[in-house]
């Protein structure tokens, strides 16, 4: 879900924090990509006659098709992608996951009715709502990335948090995801629509975290509280408080505790046993791997390995797979070209005078499994 209404709020109150551009603008950049979000996009978008692509055994291959060609597109535009996969979801997310399961049950019932009635449009709509990224989808995508020579990271917990940690640690330039909570985790740069197909003609949106805080006149802690008020994956929000009211309350009281002390509870319903404090800690100190211990290597593709993996039972066209492997190999020759700004030292941005001095805590750190470089190499 991400953060409800945050992108529109930023567009309204801090428009200078967002810029739109083409994919080629990120030539020479290393980008951490939310893998689950990508696979979900591919499972929904890569279809034939309303159904997902499958192997001869009926196994879904849409996610592999999307990963292969979309990654090649990124590489051809000079981007070095690293895919970050979700680990175990935090306990606080159980409520959100239950809601999603209930929605899928409702979609299944609606699909059964649509199938019985023979309404093709509704069948396609409810089929898409039933899409879920499984562990098998993720494992198959990881094997494909290894054969392509593209690194990936197994996050110990939330992928967006790990992406943000890689950005803050200087390992990559940005986080690429559609979920706005990458900003709540503190990613300096968030890219949306980076992995969309060319056919959709959607410009890449680049969100700048420091400029967002400047535009909203908030500290990092206040921004996290704002995101919790807007609605996140880890706890309910106060019923009746929309985006504008949330900003107004944070600007006036600065913390959720102060808001609760002054809130008109007859007008606004506070969730029972509201665990906003645990959600706050999760955003401030997420369970992530130490970026310094994450090694990222981009290697050469294993053409024969790709043909063996994707053709045959999975029914990919061999000529196209070989052509794709050659495209990846060709990008290696341009990979040595850096961006002009990489030759200069980047000075830290001038801090907003309204931002307070905050207690800097080191995030809880775990080892992440990483792979890449030589094809076929197993995660450590």
From Swiss-Prot:
Chain segments carrying region N-domain: 1-104
GO-annotated molecular function: 5'-3' exonuclease activity; 5'-flap endonuclease activity; DNA binding; magnesium ion binding; manganese ion binding; RNA-DNA hybrid ribonuclease activity
Origin superkingdom: Eukaryota
GO cellular component: mitochondrion; nucleolus; nucleoplasm
Binding site for DNA: 47, 70, 158, 231, 233
Annotated Mg(2+) 1 binding sites: 34, 86, 158, 160
Assigned EC number: 3.1.-.-
Keyword ATP-binding: no
Localization terms from the record: Nucleus, Nucleolus; Nucleus, Nucleoplasm; Mitochondrion
Predominant location: nucleus
Chain's role: Structure-specific nuclease with 5'-flap endonuclease and 5'-3' exonuclease activities involved in DNA replication and repair. During DNA replication, cleaves the 5'-overhanging flap structure that is generated by displacement synthesis when DNA polymerase encounters the 5'-end of a downstream Okazaki fragment. It enters the flap from the 5'-end and then tracks to cleave the flap base, leaving a nick for ligation. Also involved in the long patch base excision repair (LP-BER) pathway, by cleaving within the apurinic/apyrimidinic (AP) site-terminated flap.
HAMAP family in the record: Fen
Protein name: Flap endonuclease 1
């Amino acid at each position: 879900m991400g953060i409800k209404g945050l992108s529109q709020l930023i567009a309204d109150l801090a428009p200078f924090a967002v810029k739109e551009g083409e994919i080629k603008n990120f030539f020479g950049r290393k980008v951490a990509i939310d893998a689950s979000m990508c696979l979900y996009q591919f499972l929904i978008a890569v279809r034939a006659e309303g159904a997902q692509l499958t192997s001869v055994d009926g196994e879904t291959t849409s996610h592999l098709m999307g990963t292969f060609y979309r990654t090649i597109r990124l590489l051809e535009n000079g981007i070095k992608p690293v895919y970050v996969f979700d680990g175990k979801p935090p306990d606080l997310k159980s409520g959100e996951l239950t809601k999603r399961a209930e929605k899928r049950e409702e979609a299944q019932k609606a699909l059964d009715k649509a199938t019985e009635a023979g309404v093709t449009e509704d069948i396609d709509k409810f089929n898409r709502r039933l899409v879920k990224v499984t562990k098998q989808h993720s494992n198959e995508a990881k094997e494909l990335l290894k054969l392509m020579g593209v690194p990936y990271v197994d996050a110990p917990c939330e992928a967006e948090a790990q992406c943000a940690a890689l950005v803050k640690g200087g390992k990559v330039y940005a986080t690429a995801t559609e979920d706005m909570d990458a900003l709540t985790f503190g990613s300096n740069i968030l890219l949306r629509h980076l992995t969309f197909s060319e056919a959709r003609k959607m410009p890449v949106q680049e969100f700048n975290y420091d400029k967002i805080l400047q535009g909203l006149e908030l500290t990092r802690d206040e921004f996290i509280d704002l995101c919790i008020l807007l609605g996140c994956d880890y706890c309910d929000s106060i019923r009746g408080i929309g985006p504008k009211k949330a900003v107004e309350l944070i600007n006036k009281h600065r913390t959720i505790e102060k808001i609760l002390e002054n809130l008109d509870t007859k007008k606004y319903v506070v969730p029972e046993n509201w665990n906003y404090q645990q959600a706050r800690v999760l955003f401030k100190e997420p369970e992530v791997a130490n970026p310094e211990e994450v090694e990222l290597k981009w290697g050469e593709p294993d053409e024969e390995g790709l043909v063996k993996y994707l053709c045959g039972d999975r029914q990919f066209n061999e000529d196209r797979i070989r052509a794709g492997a050659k495209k990846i190999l060709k990008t290696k020759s341009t990979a040595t070209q850096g961006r002009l700004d990489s030759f200069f030292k980047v000075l830290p941005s001038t801090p907003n005078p309204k931002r307070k001095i905050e207690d800097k805590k080191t995030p809880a750190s775990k080892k992440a499994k990483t792979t890449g470089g030589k094809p076929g190499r197993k995660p450590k």
